[in-house]
A protein has these predicted regions:
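Mature, structured domains enriched in cysteine- and short glycine motifs
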Residues: 1-183
Length: 183
């Protein structure tokens, strides 16, 4: 499990008042150098939680360059070793937002065939599905499960194109597949 950082999402009354703040959407480990983070502290970043990298990438996040340095470098290097974090953030932000309409919706996402997608990509059929090992796995909070064949028709891809490029380039995500854990 990972935490995600989209900035401070709560007001002084600890009520969620925004979806995100800024373009830095990162995925962090839950424990790092003894740091503890409260769940809804005003004026501090508000942690959100992800089952694994596939969920985090599909939500538009990238690995943190501090607590997940090796994963961040692998992600970046799989796209372009010369790419700076700020440029990655701008690319992902542009892929998350639909100009004039706000956040991109699942219906706005690109259609790709399953054979064009790398393992670790999340698509939508009758719900979110992880492409892994030549099969689509259904989502649950316990992990990805119930593999089924990849359909021949185009699939709506939730994972942003930049993260698909990282997966295609060799980034190996942490996946929670029921019956296996790949790290």
């Amino acid at each position: 499990m990972f935490t995600g950082n989209r900035g401070c999402l709560v007001d002084d009354g600890e009520r969620v008042v925004r979806h995100h703040r800024g373009n830095l959407w990162i995925t962090c480990v839950t424990q790092f150098r003894g740091r503890r983070v409260g769940l809804a502290r005003p004026n501090r970043w508000t942690p959100i939680f992800f089952l694994d990298d596939a969920v985090a990438l599909a939500a538009g996040h990238r690995p943190c360059g501090e607590c997940r340095w090796a994963a961040y470098r692998a992600y970046r290097d799989a796209i372009d070793p010369a790419l700076r974090a700020g440029e990655l953030n701008r690319r992902l932000q542009a892929e998350r937002l639909d100009r004039g309409r706000g956040l991109a919706q699942a219906g706005d996402r690109k259609l790709w065939t399953g054979t064009d997608l790398p393992d670790g990509t999340v698509v939508v059929t009758d719900g979110p599905r992880l492409l892994n090992g030549g099969a689509l796995h259904a989502f649950s909070f316990a992990g990805w499960h119930s593999p089924e064949p990849v359909p021949e028709r185009p699939l709506r891809v939730l994972t942003p194109p930049t993260s698909v490029a990282a997966l295609r380039g060799g980034f190996a995500p942490v996946l929670e597949v029921v019956g296996t854990v790949r790290r």
